[in-house]
Amino acid sequence: MINHIATRLPATILSAAVLLLSTFSCNKDEPDGGSSPTPVLTDMQVVQGASTEYLSYPAQSSYEEALRGDNLTLSTTVNVATGTSNAVARWYLIEDIGPDKEIFMEDVGAREGEADYTSSITLTEEQFTELFPSGKFKERHFYCKFAFRSSERDISSTVFTSDTMTISTGLPAELMVLRIDTVNGEEPTCDYVSPPPGNNGAGIRNCTKVPGRLKVSLAGKVLYDSGEYVADQSGMTLKIRGNTSAYSAQKPYKIKLQKKKDLLFRGDEETCKDKEWVLIKGYANLNTLIGLEAVRHLGFSWVPAMQYVNVVVNDDYRGLYCLVESYKRNQKCRVDIEERGFLIEKDAYWWNEDLYFDTSGFPSNMKFTFKYPDPEDIQTEQVLYIQAYVNKAEEEIRNGGDYGKYIDLESFARWILFHDIFATLDCAGSNLYLAKKDMTSNSKLEMLSPWDFDSIYWNGTFTQCWSNQHMYWAFYYPALLSNPNKAFLEKYKAEWNRVRGTIGDHMDRTIGEFVEKYGDAINQSRYLNAMRWGGGFADCNDNLADMRSWLRDRVGFLDSNIPSMK
């Protein structure tokens, strides 16, 4: 058996993509009334089972043109190795509701002995427009049935049915597509809340978790299907996440699977699988990719992995996102802490949490909240322990004491060095995550990977300045960098000397390779994202050029200033 897809689209295609996937299987149905000579499907590609072939097309000049090609032709061929006579092919469109719709039939004709039978269907511009309305993401599913009638017995036939042929308009084949269908089409909701006087930010609460089904595909091939929602067995839940980012029309989301899965498909399922994943809006720039790659080069104990994906919820295209591992305890693939360990955040949004604690060493309008243990599971002794431990660390920092007994100097130095390399603007709500492995003196407070990269580059305005975390007293860094105990300053200088000669080349190579491989697909997706939500977007090559220019300037600035720090 062989399958084939032939297509014809306008030569002017420049900005979005049409993706086709066809698989052909040999599902054999023999009607009642006696047997007939059974056609034997031969594998002309010498592979096991059904073969799969897909094609993707370059970008089109406008979203309108992407969905309104002059025509589209699907063609499939089946090879029959024994004598049959007439063959009739019927093409069907799978309807969302009701029986499948027959849209085309043709008499393929008679053959003698081993022969190929081919049937094609062409969608005219009018049909294409009807099936794929302009301005909307849409998937349509087709299949073809070949009915072969014996040359000797015209009362029975053998039918071969193709697997579904999926045509998805508008989404490039190089990026994964996350398709989420919620139960009864329900959308997740949240309430928007403001901070108490004297505090920062605007947040959300009462976020509903909507059950549903998740399918992940690449180039039309389904890589993962969670199945329909059954609590603790299959499916997933979807909810809105974030703080101020949740106020925009395009929402950030959190996905929670009922069964663990590595949605990034890294080839080590047992190690990398987890239930919790986040979708961060990723259309505006490459900041999340650039930030996480720089963090990885600096050598943090764990760095969230990510991929750019397109997201469709209830047949509605939601845009280009970063699918990212969430911050949580998972000793195999995320934050490696013991059951009696801690994952905490110095949090500007503490007022929107059920449990938090304060410390006395460095008064601020930020307090500590818990990522692990869950507030409903934590015991009073655990809260008192970590509060006392952080208070002691702050006391040592404030007094110029032996703070190295309480904080991990290496991770603390790498954290602020990252922000200084990129001159991060954000100071208060910049996702200050810390971990302590257990409740013993064998572990220290560790700074975890930076997370929020929206304000790196100081928005591209200033190259000759420190990060705000370096300069302002929102956290410990001004005290550590100017401390009479120079242990931290020396570690900070050592970390810069370790990476200063490699950071530029590493970022140039890794981000350059990424843009070469995925840049066109991301640019196409950014265009579709803008069509869906409005706003402008930059070209990935411009993002790459900006990063290269920035790092050249920053290495010079840091080389001129770090050695003289006292």
Residue ranges and their predicted role:
Residues 97-129:
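Surface-exposed, flexible coil segments in extracellular/virion-facing regions
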Residues 82-89:
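Solvent-exposed loop segments of extracellular immunoglobulin-like
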Residues 53-70:
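Short, solvent-exposed loop/linker segments at the N-terminal edge
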Residues 18-49, 155, 161-164, 168-171:
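Bacterial Sec-dependent N-terminal signal peptides
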Residues 256-262, 272-282, 286, 299-304, ...:
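Internal "kinase-insert"/substrate-recognition segments embedded within catalytic cores
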